[in-house]
Amino acid sequence: MESKEELRQRIGDLAFEVTQHAATERAFTGQYDDFFEKGIYVDVVSGEVLFSSLDKFNSGCGWPAFSRPIHHRMVTNHHDSSHGMRRVEVKSREAGSHLGHVFNDGPREAGGLRYCINSAALKFIPYDQMEQEGYAEWLGIFDKS
């Protein structure tokens, strides 16, 4: 089992603070905010599949935004009343990594949700590398688009 210090060294300080202590990266600074390549986004801690580029949109909020997770069972929602706000925190199911928050102001035609996710909590797997990275079972989602 990986220690917290080993995890910090593997994923970096910012990703560690975001995923393990629910920190938030500054708006418009994350590598995936204005990034729209074809592929999937996985938890930087565990590698579990979270989101697809098919559901990513430009919300203008400064963080990557998705209309839904790749499958509803991949994330969990939690009440968050930190910083004097009432929000819904989003975590990865397996690792319990803090990812960001979900809001009810997303594209209406896509279900109305906006998953506002920290880039530091994610690792992008390009479509053409999914098979070699061990994510071949998810290639089929792109056939439906």
From Swiss-Prot:
Keywords: Oxidoreductase. The active site is at C116. GO terms for biological process: protein repair; response to oxidative stress. SUPFAM superfamilies: Mss4-like. It catalyses: L-methionyl-[protein] + [thioredoxin]-disulfide + H2O = L-methionyl-(R)-S-oxide-[protein] + [thioredoxin]-dithiol. GO terms for cellular component: cytoplasm. Residues 4-127 form the MsrB domain. InterPro entries: Met_Sox_Rdtase_MsrB (IPR028427), Met_Sox_Rdtase_MsrB_dom (IPR002579), Mss4-like_sf (IPR011057). PROSITE patterns: MSRB. Pfam families: SelR. GO terms for molecular function: peptide-methionine (R)-S-oxide reductase activity. Its EC number is 1.8.4.12. It is an enzyme of class 1 (oxidoreductase). HAMAP family: MsrB. Belongs to the MsrB Met sulfoxide reductase family. This is Peptide methionine sulfoxide reductase MsrB.
